[in-house]
């Protein structure tokens, strides 16, 4: 799959089985705050947008022509995803003010739009973009966490843990 900024993707909702076509940026606006708290620093949200975009394109490459959907909303199979209306509803139930909801949505939009043409590749291929929010002092090699093949771009590194990791 060649990266296209205005790509339309098909997302399957696990609870209903419905498949909805949407712009990839709308999808990413739903993934970023579903995978990472919108209170995090804008640079962390941008990194999440790039990783989510890369993961999406890599995943789409494995789907055949006859597949019903490109992605789903199940975080154990694809990536966590909530559409805008659902996110706003969740945030309201958590007691977020309308002002804070607007601030978070603007931040998420900025993260997605400002990284629009950015994906991560290794030797011309989209990487397997596994991610996590925090790693105290050191990351691990991917094969030690998920098993399977070693990936030269996902190796253990020292990490100076900071309290403001967001």
Residues covered by each model-derived region:
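Conserved, single-site charged/polar hotspot
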Residues: 1-166
């Amino acid at each position: 799959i060649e990266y296209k900024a205005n790509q339309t993707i098909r997302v399957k909702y696990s609870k209903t089985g419905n498949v909805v076509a949407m712009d990839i940026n709308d999808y990413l606006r739903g993934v970023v705050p579903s995978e990472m708290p919108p209170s995090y620093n804008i640079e962390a949200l941008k990194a999440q947008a790039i990783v989510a975009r890369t993961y999406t394109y890599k995943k789409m490459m494995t789907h055949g022509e006859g597949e019903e959907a490109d992605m789903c909303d199940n975080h154990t199979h694809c990536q966590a995803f909530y559409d805008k209306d659902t996110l706003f509803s969740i945030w309201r139930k958590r007691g977020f003010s309308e002002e804070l909801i607007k601030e978070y949505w603007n931040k998420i939009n900025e993260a997605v739009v400002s990284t629009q043409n950015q994906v991560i590749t290794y030797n011309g291929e989209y990487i397997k973009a596994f991610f996590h929010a925090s790693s105290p002092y050191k990351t691990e090699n991917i094969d030690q966490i998920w098993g399977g093949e070693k990936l030269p771009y996902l190796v253990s590194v020292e990490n100076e843990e900071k309290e403001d990791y967001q």
